[in-house]
Structures are given as C-alpha cells and as structure tokens.
C-alpha cells in the first residue's frame, strides 16, 4: 500500500499490478511465448515478476496467461517463492480482452499498474511514479523521447513532413490508472473502427487526460531477435557491475 495525501487528507492506496503475458513470439520466429525465452539464465517474465514482487507498494499481482501455459507460469512463481501473485487469468483474443479479464478479478484496489510481460527491465522507480501520478491524475504512462528523427511518409513512400521530437513520446509500460476509471473505460462501448492499441489509447478515446512521466531507455519491449541480443548484453553488464560491488 501507498500512503497518499488527497485534498489535505492522508489515506492508504491499495495497488494491484496486472502483467500481460499471453502473447506470442511470432515476430521473433519462435514457436514459444517469448516471455519464456531465457536471458541471463532467467526467463524474461521472471524479471518483471520479481520487480513487482519486491516493490513495497504493490499489494497483489494478477498475471494474464494463455490457458496451456498456466502451469509453466505457476512453476516459475512457486520455484521463486513469489507471494504476491494472487491470480492467473486466461487471456482473451486481444490485449484489451486480456486486460478486462484481469480487471474483473481485482477487488478493492485503488490503483492498477498494467505492464507488458515482455518488458523485463522495469524498475521500482517507474512503478512508484506510476502509482503516484495515477493517484494524482487518474491515468498516466511512462515514455521516452525518440532518439531518431521521426518523419511522416505518404502512400508512395515519399516524405511528407518531419515531426518535432520535443512533442513526441515513445510510450512504454507500466501504464497506471485509478481502478474505477480504467474499469469503466474498458466496459464502455467502443466503435469497432477505432484502433485501441493500449490502455492509454482507450483513455484518450474517452476524453480523459493521460499524464506522461519520464520512462527509461533500458525499459525495452522484447519484440525482435535484435532486442534479445541487447537484453543479453544489458544483463551481463548489470551482473558485472553488481559483482564488482560485492
């Protein structure tokens, strides 16, 4: 729980994490769910699970999984003595359906922190800020300024314009919300032609402001084989630094 001040009154905020891990590794050319791929002798999903498990302000974790992979997740959870993973729910046909399935089993939480299981290098700081700004603004996400120049092209592949990076954000997770706001949002009828790519897109569509705070460039999503190479090197260097301090 988190102790927060709202309008001069101090209260405890109960915080629940949803980790979405029901995806595939198709873009990487693997037949298995990419969150089970090992980096640094641990499956990708274990990194984010451990980060939320060890965060003092996270009260419970709901994991979203494919039905035929639940036993694999249970093995990881039990063998690492994780106590905060209270429920594993089956994912839906879309990410939005998966999040709804997780939200439906959460009781009495003030803030929900939603994270992609394929982002192993989440930090306590990103989680803490997500909880803080969700309590303050209702909806928030972390993100980083793109390093490359971003341009818009036309249908014939000619550049139309260059965009100002000062106003561009590469959105990451976690994305954090007051529970009531995100629950009501997901239960709102949405035009099927509207492309809802993440939970902040839903908030935008419904007219809610979403606060953006600084993410971390290391908080990558493992999507390609190149991402996997970077992740392996990052873990090696992190372990080398840690070993040099002990």
UniProtKB/Swiss-Prot annotation:
Top-level EC class as recorded in UniProt: transferase
SUPFAM superfamilies: Nucleotide-diphospho-sugar transferases
Catalysed reactions, as listed in the record: 2-C-methyl-D-erythritol 4-phosphate + CTP + H(+) = 4-CDP-2-C-methyl-D-erythritol + diphosphate
Signal sequence region: none
Origin superkingdom: Bacteria
One Pfam family from the record: IspD
A molecular-function term among this protein's GO annotations: 2-C-methyl-D-erythritol 4-phosphate cytidylyltransferase activity
Site (Positions MEP for the nucleophilic attack): 165, 221
Listed GO biological process terms: isopentenyl diphosphate biosynthetic process, methylerythritol 4-phosphate pathway
Positions of the record's site feature: Transition state stabilizer: 27, 34
EC identifiers of the protein: 2.7.7.60
Pathway: Isoprenoid biosynthesis; isopentenyl diphosphate biosynthesis via DXP pathway; isopentenyl diphosphate from 1-deoxy-D-xylulose 5-phosphate: step 2/6
Keywords: Isoprene biosynthesis, Nucleotidyltransferase, Transferase
Family, as annotated: Belongs to the IspD/TarI cytidylyltransferase family. IspD subfamily.
Physiological role: Catalyzes the formation of 4-diphosphocytidyl-2-C-methyl-D-erythritol from CTP and 2-C-methyl-D-erythritol 4-phosphate (MEP).
Annotated protein name in UniProt: 2-C-methyl-D-erythritol 4-phosphate cytidylyltransferase
GN (gene name): ispD
């Amino acid at each position: 729980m988190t102790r927060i001040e709202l309008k001069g009154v101090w209260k405890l905020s109960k915080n629940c994490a949803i980790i979405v891990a029901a995806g595939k590794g198709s873009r990487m050319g693997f037949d298995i769910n990419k969150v089970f791929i090992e980096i640094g002798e641990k499956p990708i999903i274990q990194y984010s699970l451990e980060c939320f498990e060890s965060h003092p302000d996270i009260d419970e974790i709901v994991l979203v999984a494919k039905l035929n992979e639940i036993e694999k997740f249970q093995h990881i959870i039990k063998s690492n003595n994780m106590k905060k993973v209270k429920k594993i729910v089956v994912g839906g046909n879309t990410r939005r359906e998966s999040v709804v399935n997780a939200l439906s089993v959460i009781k009495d939480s003030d803030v929900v922190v939603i994270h992609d299981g394929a982002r192993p290098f989440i930090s306590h700081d990103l989680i803490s800020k997500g909880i803080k700004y969700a309590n303050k603004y209702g909806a928030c996400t972390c993100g980083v300024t793109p390093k490359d120049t971003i341009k818009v092209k036309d249908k014939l592949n000619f550049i139309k314009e260059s965009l100002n990076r000062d106003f561009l954000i590469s959105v990451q997770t976690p994305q954090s919300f007051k529970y009531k706001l995100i629950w009501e949002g997901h239960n709102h009828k949405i035009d099927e032609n509207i492309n809802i790519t993440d939970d902040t897109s839903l908030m935008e569509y419904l007219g809610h402001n979403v606060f953006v705070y600084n993410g971390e460039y290391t908080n990558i999503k493992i999507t390609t084989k190149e991402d996997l190479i970077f992740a392996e090197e990052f873990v090696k260097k992190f372990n080398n630094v840690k070993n040099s301090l002990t």
